């Protein structure tokens, strides 16, 4: 899920990205995350481009 909020006063766009990865057998090390996170983020970006990921305006939904 991606939520966003535009701060009119400060002219800032805040974006929060939540990624759930289930069935991870053990807590990954920082090195393991550094290795796999770029691929995960690329896959996530493709899902956004293909319309498979919903973008939610935080003000409209009251989620922030």
Swiss-Prot record:
Superkingdom as given in the UniProt entry: Viruses
Protein name as annotated: Uncharacterized protein 64
Organism: Sulfolobus islandicus rod-shaped virus 1 (SIRV-1)
